[in-house]
Design a protein with these regions (language model features):
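Active-site core of glycosidic bond-cleaving carbohydrate-active enzymes
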Residues: 2-117
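Carbohydrate-binding surface patches
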Residues: 143-173
């Protein structure tokens, strides 16, 4: 279906980490990530149907900013159709307007902005650092999280070595 690496690169052992059968902190998770990155990807993205691959989830969990962003942009840029704002299923422009790809693009954007890890909520862990240039801000309003609706406002004041943030979520969750 477009590439012979599909079973290994997209539907293989990385799903054991994604489904938390293997803990992301275990050494074998790093081994799988390195193996996949070296043998199954080009520019940190799979050759076909890249939104099936879950190495980006592990990169986000581990706070690997540059690899995560490489995957994010090398996946989004060639698959997004600027005329329709939808995504192709394959790099060679077969099967347009795929809701699976569109939903996963949105989920990866969510992971970039906020991502739960057990009882911890990580905010802006793998965003491009330039998004927090002095005077810039990021706001999330009413986004859904495992902790209930979430409101976040972060304002950069890096000139004075600080970023100020306010976070509101349901304290009972």
């Amino acid at each position: 279906h477009g590439t012979f690496t599909v079973p290994d690169a997209m539907l293989g052992p990385m799903y054991l980490v994604f489904c938390e059968v293997i803990d992301p902190a275990e050494p074998v998770s790093d081994l799988l990530l390195k193996y996949h990155s070296e043998l199954m990807f080009q520019e940190n993205s799979t050759f076909s149907q890249p939104y099936y691959s879950r190495h980006n989830w592990l990169q986000a969990k581990k706070g690997m900013v540059k690899p995560f962003l490489s995957t994010y942009y090398h996946t989004m840029a060639p698959y997004a159709d600027p005329g329709t704002y939808t995504f192709w299923e394959h790099l060679y422009k077969l099967s347009p307007h795929k809701t699976h790809e569109e939903a996963n693009f949105l989920m990866e954007t969510r992971w970039m902005l906020y991502m739960e890890d057990a009882d911890t909520l990580n905010l802006f862990r793998v965003i491009p650092r330039r998004w927090m240039a002095d005077g810039d801000r990021i706001e999330l309003s009413g986004v859904q999280s495992y902790f209930g609706p979430l409101n976040v406002r972060a304002v950069s004041n890096v000139r004075n070595n600080r970023i100020e943030a306010s976070v509101r979520c349901d304290p009972a969750r």
